[in-house]
């Protein structure tokens, strides 16, 4: 039996692949926002810690874990690595495809703290953060001392999380599917944008190109490295991480 952790485009692809096999599998997401159609799959919702995952795997005879979660879901990645080691269950990491890092036009940041330091050093006063609602608290030193806007998903759970982190709702803007990335940038006139290295399926290239065309500075947080205990696939090739074939990141 196979257990997939998803909630992403990659999760959908994994579902489609396993549905074609015609055998039962489990699909787990943290929340209930992703709408997926399952015939052979069984939906699970809610976060699980290592003990809960190990127990579930033992009870349901899980022999393979597929990590198709967001590249920045570091807690889940670490939990699955722990489960894999302790239960001897292999993990396939369904990785996104990432463009080569542009060192000329993008200021790359190791993590959130590094991003805060570099943005403050450059004296950026108006910032548009496209890093998601869960990063508001991590970036608090920026919005406490400058004008920061966050674009988030237009749903109640996101607004609730923003309020819980103490962020002003007047500086929240909502993602509109299919909307040109330049629309919000032209409306807010930020000096810089802050992104996650979210890959092609995360719209990274479109955001970068929109900012470049408008002369807006770009800061990007590097994706976390994938565990070398995972077997990594990206839909185009199979490799064991780290790999020399991905020279710009050996998330």
Residue ranges and their predicted role:
Residues 239-244:
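Conserved small/polar residues in nucleotide/adenosyl-binding loops
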Residues 1-21, 26-28, 89-93, 97-171, ...:
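Non-catalytic interface/targeting segments
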Residues 63-64, 126, 191-192:
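Structural motif
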Residues 163, 167-169, 175-184, 188, ...:
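A C-terminal functional module that forms or caps the active site or interfaces directly
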Residues 49-101, 199:
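N-terminal glycine-rich phosphate/adenylate-binding segment common to multiple enzyme folds
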Residues 41-56, 172-180:
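Glycine-rich, highly charged phosphate/nucleotide-binding loops
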Residues 27-47, 161-163:
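N-terminal beta-loop-helix "entrance" segment that forms/cooperates
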Residues 86-105, 214-229:
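Short, acidic/small-residue loops that bind anionic groups at enzyme active sites
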């Amino acid at each position: 039996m196979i257990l997939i952790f998803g909630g992403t485009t990659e999760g959908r692809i994994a579902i489609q692949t396993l549905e074609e096999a015609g055998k039962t599998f489990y699909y787990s997401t943290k929340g209930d926002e992703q709408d997926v159609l399952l015939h052979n799959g069984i939906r699970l919702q809610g976060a699980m810690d290592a003990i809960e995952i190990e127990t579930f795997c033992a009870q349901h005879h899980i022999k393979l874990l597929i990590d198709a979660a967001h590249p920045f879901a570091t807690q889940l990645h670490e939990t699955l690595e722990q489960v894999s080691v302790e239960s001897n269950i292999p993990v396939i990491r369904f990785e996104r495809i990432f463009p080569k890092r542009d060192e000329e036009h993008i200021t790359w940041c190791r993590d959130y703290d590094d991003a805060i330091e570099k943005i403050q050093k450059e004296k950026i006063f108006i910032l548009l953060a496209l890093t998601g609602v869960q990063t508001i608290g991590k970036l608090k030193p920026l919005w406490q001392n400058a004008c920061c806007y966050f674009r988030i998903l237009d749903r109640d759970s996101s607004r609730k999380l923003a309020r819980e982190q103490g962020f002003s709702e007047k500086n929240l803007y909502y993602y509109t599917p299919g909307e040109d990335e330049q629309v919000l940038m032209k409306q807010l006139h930020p000096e810089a944008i802050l992104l996650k290295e979210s890959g092609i399926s995360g719209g990274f290239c479109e955001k970068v190109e929109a900012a470049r065309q408008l002369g807006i500075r770009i800061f990007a947080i590097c994706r976390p490295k994938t565990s070398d205990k995972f077997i990594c696939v990206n839909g185009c090739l199979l490799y064991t991480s780290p790999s020399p074939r991905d020279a710009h990141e050996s998330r």
